[in-house]
């Protein structure tokens, strides 16, 4: 009979006992708020250099923006790997395996730091070549290289924050990372203003501010874990990599990370097609993207909740609760997504006017919102179903199907369909088509695997 796991900290959540319906939003909404805050704080970098760097403001804004694809690829890859940490610890907590929890926590910390250094070193060496390959204008390149090199210096602590956040999420504590991010984000904004306005720096100022604020947030989470209960307590003496646990983390996390990286590449290809349509279209698409990502953060947070709840209950052998988690996640996420989309569409033109006063840009941006949101139900469904499968440790299948359904379809669409009808709407149709196809593929995989039945015998035998 599975043991009941007790968690001491009030921020933590008992996922394997009691009602599920009221705990899912308590887990998911802080995750959504954290992601939205990250978007806002990242935007502050551009806002500060765009307003306070004098003659260099145009090049500075372009330099920060030009680094987004590179930084996005790196972060998406390692955030995916951190998901493996979340699942492994959640499974171990569910089966009351304190030893595995401890090994996973300490392995994750070193994985983040070592991974950061392994990427940082070649990144520093080849920064010029990487950014030059992206056809960045000559007047922007020096600023872009400066920003990237400073950012890479802080990559180990930036990755550490994401891995430590995954540890907290695995026990249901999504509030602590949110509070720490909110405080460090405010510090980031203040440092941006200090370095750029007072010290007259440009992109180097906002890059240094980003590194410092991330370092502080990582240190705070590190200290909190050192003072935590025995389940996820961190000890400097115990810092070592457990090869078996690392293998399990990578088995789940690496496919998710590669999926996110390939996802980013497909979006770069779409962005290139958008860029070919001129300045107005680029401005409209960029403004709309900054709005629609908020809705994505909301429904994706329920996917993370589903993964963690399923992970713990699978570890505890409570497969009926796993299935119930899936159904409740879909139901509650549908409501949350519908409310978010409704609010965004109702105020869409006003929100777009924050970014631009050009009526043509606003209308094109609203067109993008309508087409993207028409398929967000499908996106929500495949994210939840993928999260459910990952909770059982099935990570490669949703990663492959998402790569085929989303990335493959979009690349095909841009290179085959778009040339015959090179309009903004043609590009945007790639989103509902790819998202709906992926939802169907993941649903078929869910029916084929049927984890709650497939693992029933294995759990009973343990």
Region locations from a protein language model:
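Small-residue-rich hydrophobic transmembrane alpha-helices
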Residues: 61-121, 158-177, 284-348, 379-402, ...
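Short runs within selected transmembrane alpha-helices of multi-pass transporters and secretion channels
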Residues: 79-82, 151-169, 177-188, 206-221, ...
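Helix-loop interface residues and adjacent transmembrane-helix termini in multi-pass membrane transporters
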Residues: 40-43, 52-58, 92-95, 170-171, ...
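Alpha-helical transmembrane segments of multipass membrane proteins
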Residues: 43-47, 121, 163-167, 186-197, ...
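Short alpha-helical transmembrane segments in multi-pass integral membrane proteins
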Residues: 1-28, 89-154, 198-254, 310-375, ...
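Transmembrane helix-bundle signature of multi-pass secondary active exporters and lipid flippases
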Residues: 32-87, 151-158, 247-312, 333-340, ...
């Amino acid at each position: 009979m599975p043991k009941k796991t007790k968690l001491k900290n009030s921020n933590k959540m008992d996922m394997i006992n009691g009602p599920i319906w009221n705990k899912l939003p308590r887990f998911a909404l802080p995750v959504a708020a954290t992601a939205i805050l990250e978007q806002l704080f990242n935007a502050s970098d551009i806002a500060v250099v765009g307003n306070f760097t004098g003659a260099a403001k145009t090049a500075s804004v372009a330099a920060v923006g030009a680094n987004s694809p590179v930084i996005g690829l790196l972060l998406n890859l390692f955030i995916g790997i951190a998901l493996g940490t979340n699942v492994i610890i959640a499974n171990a907590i569910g089966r009351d395996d304190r030893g595995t929890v401890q090994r996973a926590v300490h392995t994750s910390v070193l994985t983040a730091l070592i991974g950061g250094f392994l990427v940082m070193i070649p990144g520093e060496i080849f920064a010029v070549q990487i950014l030059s390959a992206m056809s960045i204008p000559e007047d922007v390149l020096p600023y872009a290289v400066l920003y990237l090199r400073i950012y890479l210096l802080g990559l180990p602590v930036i990755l550490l924050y994401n891995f430590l956040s995954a540890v907290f999420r695995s026990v249901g504590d999504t509030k602590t990372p949110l509070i720490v991010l909110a405080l460090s984000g405010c510090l980031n904004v203040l440092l941006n203003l200090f370095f750029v306005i007072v010290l007259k720096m440009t992109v180097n100022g906002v890059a240094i501010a980003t590194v410092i604020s991330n370092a502080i947030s990582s240190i705070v989470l590190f200290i909190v874990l050192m003072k935590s209960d025995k389940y996820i307590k961190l000890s400097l003496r115990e810092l070592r990599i457990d090869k078996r646990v690392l293998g399990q983390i990578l088995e789940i996390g690496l496919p998710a990370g590669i999926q996110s990286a390939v996802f980013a590449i497909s979006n770069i290809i779409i962005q290139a097609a958008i860029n070919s349509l001129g300045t107005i279209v680029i401005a409209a698409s960029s403004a709309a993207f900054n709005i629609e990502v908020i809705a994505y953060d909301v429904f994706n947070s329920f996917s993370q909740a589903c993964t963690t709840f399923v992970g713990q209950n699978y570890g505890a052998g409570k497969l009926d609760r796993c299935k119930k988690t899936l159904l409740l996640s879909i139901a509650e996420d549908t409501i949350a997504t519908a409310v978010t989309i409704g609010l965004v569409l109702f105020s869409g033109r006003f929100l777009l006017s924050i970014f631009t006063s050009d009526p043509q840009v606003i209308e094109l941006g609203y067109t993008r919102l309508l087409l993207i949101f028409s398929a967000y139900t499908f996106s929500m469904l495949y994210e939840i179903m993928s999260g459910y499968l990952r909770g059982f440790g099935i990570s490669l299948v949703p990663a492959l199907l998402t790569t085929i359904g989303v990335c493959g379809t979009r690349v095909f669409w841009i290179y085959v369909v778009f040339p015959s009808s090179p309009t903004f709407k043609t590009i945007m149709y790639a989103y509902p088509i790819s998202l709906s196809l992926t939802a169907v593929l993941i649903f078929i995989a869910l029916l084929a695997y049927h984890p709650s039945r497939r693992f029933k015998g294995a759990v009973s035998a343990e």
